Regions:
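Extended alpha-helical targeting/anchoring segments
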Residues: 1-491
């Protein structure tokens, strides 16, 4: 904890937000229990991670209710402060404006702070591509969900859970422009510690148990319509327009249980590198994404293409046989090589010459219902590179669009009946100092207005089997189908 004199010295240096940190011994809590005690409500989030399919990441991040929220719909920005819309304006370059918003907050980088201690948190929906590629700006499909194209919360109060040490870091950012800023931040930290010490989180039992299964999810396509879409995609491939494209289907079901219960079930069923629960008040996002979109950290840019899928085996022996089959499949290997090349091209546009490398190639990662081939491409970022530059170079992921990317996106616009909204976009954080970590929004549910929506795609190449591609999308959705069924039944 910084002293009052240290705080005043930081104010004198011109910082616009100053973090105060309280370290709490919290070995009897979990990240989820801390979320329920401190954050359960609108404009909050919980981020967790499982590395290598088996080991929980060291840090979990809990976002307490954000007072300021930025929403973008097309080129119209809306700013909400403490529940009131305070600003609406047109933006010529929305992504440049987001970088300006981040730069408004000058925060000292103190040695005791974790990698993320505050900043912008939220999502960039799939239609963000319209800000990057003007010819894709008119996504003239029905907008079934109506979610903002971009939504970012200003995370000024966060709790960072150290899973290794059983310690919790409560972080409150004081605004020096406010009277008694230091004392108010201390009082806020005292109140948070008090809430932590009040025993278990309040969590009433579900009043109505509902039986759901996979057949209750209704697709935007019939099976026959999806297979016909695959055939149309293959016609473009045969004509030489593209090498690959990734069409998807959306599956929806009525849902009135607690959204956080879907997260509870999902983190047990399908632990993944990116686990997230984001409560936006009128909607919730629940996901267990296996795939990074892009990470910018300490001057390094990383993407990690994930493509090539098999269902999990019933035994370890069957898993190993399926892994060998997957790695030997010429179609899967060709598709994966194509996406490594796309990643190298994307990273090469924003990296120092000669620094781009494939640091991991054709590894297998196992998840609850499927296994994937994964590789990693990284480079040394160009000087003064911002995450918005990274987003422009890498968005959307080639694994959710195709190659060549722009033509594949045009074909997706033609083939799919709805805007993708959050699906296949990016979810994560941009820190005060410019580092960022975002996942691709796959294996993700969006809950709003009494309905829950899941979306999944399949990579189509010249010899794809339409029936097999339908089944691949269903396999990718099954962890969520099971989690939703458990939540509806009651945990």
């Amino acid at each position: 904890m910084i002293s009052r004199d240290e705080f005043d010295a930081l104010v004198a240096r011109g910082h616009t937000r100053i973090p105060l940190v309280r370290e709490v011994f919290s070995d009897l809590d979990t990240p989820l229990s801390v979320y329920l005690k401190l954050a359960d409500g609108p404009y909050t989030f919980l981020f967790e991670s499982v590395e290598g399919g088996a080991t929980w990441g060291r840090y979990s991040i809990i976002g307490l209710p954000a007072k300021r929220v930025y929403r973008l719909r097309g080129h119209e920005l809306e700013v909400e402060d403490s529940g009131e819309v305070t600003e609406r304006r047109h933006l010529d370059d929305p992504l440049a404006e987001i970088e300006k918003l981040r730069l408004q907050y000058d925060v000292p980088r103190l040695p005791q702070l974790p990698a993320f201690s505050g900043g912008l948190v939220g999502y960039f929906g799939f239609e963000t591509i319209g800000y990057i590629e003007p010819r894709l700006a008119q996504w003239d499909r029905a907008d079934e969900l109506g979610t903002p194209d971009v939504l970012l919360m200003l995370a000024e109060e966060v709790a960072v859970f150290d899973n290794l040490k059983g310690r919790l870091y409560l972080i409150v950012h004081a605004d020096p422009a406010q009277p008694q800023a230091y004392a108010e931040a201390q009082r806020r930290l005292d109140a948070l510690v008090y809430r932590l010490r009040q025993g278990g989180a309040s969590y009433p039992q579900l009043t109505q148990s509902i039986a759901l299964d996979e057949s209750d999810f209704k697709s935007s396509f019939t099976k026959e319509e999806f297979e016909a879409m695959v055939e149309r995609a293959k016609e473009y491939i045969r004509a030489g327009d593209i090498f690959q494209v990734v069409p998807s289907q959306r599956l929806s079901v009525g849902f009135n249980a607690r959204p956080v219960d879907v997260y509870r079930a999902l983190r047990a069923l399908n632990p993944s590198p990116y686990m997230y629960f984001v409560d936006l008040g009128d909607s919730q996002i629940v996901g267990s994404s296996p795939e990074i979109l892009a990470r910018l950290k300490d001057g390094k840019v990383v993407v990690r293409p994930l493509a090539g899928t098999r269902k999990r085996g019933a035994t370890e022996e069957e898993d190993r046989a399926l892994e060998a089959e997957l790695l030997a499949d010429p179609k899967e290997r060709a598709e994966h090589v194509m996406l490594i090349d796309l990643g190298r091209n994307d990273i090469g546009r924003i990296s120092e010459t000669g620094t781009v490398e494939v640091s991991e190639s054709f590894a297998i990662e196992r998840y609850s219902h499927v296994m994937h081939i994964v590789s990693q491409v990284q480079g040394t970022a160009l000087p003064n590179l911002s995450y918005m530059d990274v987003l422009k170079a890498t968005f959307p992921a080639g694994t959710l669009s195709g190659a060549p990317k722009i033509r594949a996106l045009e074909i997706i616009q033609e083939l799919e009946p709805y805007k993708r909204n959050i699906y296949a976009g990016a979810i994560g954080w941009i820190g005060w100092w410019g580092d960022a970590d975002t996942a691709i929004a796959i294996r993700t549910a969006v809950i709003q207005n009494g309905r829950l929506h899941v979306q999944a795609g399949a990579g189509i190449v010249y010899d794809s089997d339409p029936a097999a591609e339908w089944e691949e999308t269903m396999n990718k959705g099954r962890a969520l189908f099971r989690a939703v069924a458990q939540a509806a039944k009651g945990l």
